[in-house]
Amino acid sequence: MKEYLNFLQFILDHGVAKTDRTGIGTKSVFGYEMRFNLREGFPLVTTKKIHLKSVIYELLWFLRGDTNIQFLNDNGVTIWDEWADENGDLGPIYGKQWRRWHCPDGRTVDQMQRLIREIKTNPDSRRLIVSAWNVGELDQMALPPCHLLFQFYVADGFLSCKLTQRSADAFLGVPFNIASYSLLTHLIARQCNLKAGEFIWSGGDCHIYNTHQDQVSTQLSREPRALPQLIINRDPSSLYDYNFNDFSIVNYHPHPAIKAPVAV
């Protein structure tokens, strides 16, 4: 994944010093795009080991419409713990918006269900979009959505996805987001009798935290390795019925993990 290393280097070369909500400080650029051909392998960063278990369980959690960390914790995933309240709740974040978007008239919309229906019945639509940025509920969220909107595109039997991310933690967050939405693209493609085409990542405020500078330097010193392959072992009748054991990543041979503090 040379594209990702180029992204890190671009921030180092062109970024400006900025303050931020966490008080840590960043080097930041505004606007960057990366493209990954999902037919050439699964875009899982190889210059450090990615905790794939967390990627998969978080996506399954989103698809459940869940906003409490209990499901994650029960499966050994703690990536949302810092933001949860004493009851494990996070407010109306991603899962709630994907599956139960509240309308002014009191209705709720299952955006994922509507998306799949539209892909199947109107694949040339330019409205194949899911948004997590519900302005009316932002103040109730433990953390407003960083990856806030994604759009799909169907052509020649392939399904492609473009993710828009307003705030991009380049070292810790972005590799995770690339893997998560690439997996989602594969799942939706299979549910719609399509093949996964391309994943496009588009970032707004793309930043490296000051506390991640050494880790980024270490990662840039490493040579990328061949991408692994995603194997999906089962196709349930519903997008929401996948489980962790339905997925295998083969030929993933990353460099060792690089630890870094999370900016809360």
Curated annotation (Swiss-Prot):
PROSITE patterns membership: THYMIDYLATE_SYNTHASE (PS00091)
A Gene Ontology molecular function term of the record: thymidylate synthase activity
One GO-annotated biological process of the protein: dTTP biosynthetic process
InterPro entries the UniProt entry points to: Thymidate_synth/dCMP_Mease (IPR045097), Thymidate_synth/dCMP_Mease_dom (IPR023451), Thymidate_synth/dCMP_Mease_sf (IPR036926), Thymidylate_synthase (IPR000398), Thymidylate_synthase_AS (IPR020940)
Localisation per UniProt entry: Cytoplasm
Principal EC category: transferase
Binding site for (6R)-5,10-methylene-5,6,7,8-tetrahydrofolate: 51, 169, 263
Catalytic activity: dUMP + (6R)-5,10-methylene-5,6,7,8-tetrahydrofolate = 7,8-dihydrofolate + dTMP
Gene Ontology cellular-component terms listed: cytosol
List of residues binding dUMP: 21, 126-127, 166-169, 177, 207-209
Functional pathway: Pyrimidine metabolism; dTTP biosynthesis
Residue numbers annotated as active site: 146 (nucleophile)
One Pfam family it belongs to: Thymidylat_synt
Keyword annotations: Cytoplasm, Methyltransferase, Nucleotide biosynthesis, Transferase
EC number: 2.1.1.45
Function text: Catalyzes the reductive methylation of 2'-deoxyuridine-5'-monophosphate (dUMP) to 2'-deoxythymidine-5'-monophosphate (dTMP) while utilizing 5,10-methylenetetrahydrofolate (mTHF) as the methyl donor and reductant in the reaction, yielding dihydrofolate (DHF) as a by-product. This enzymatic reaction provides an intracellular de novo source of dTMP, an essential precursor for DNA biosynthesis.
Family in the record: Belongs to the thymidylate synthase family. Bacterial-type ThyA subfamily.
Subunit structure: Homodimer.
Protein name: Thymidylate synthase
Organism encoding this protein: Coxiella burnetii (strain RSA 493 / Nine Mile phase I)
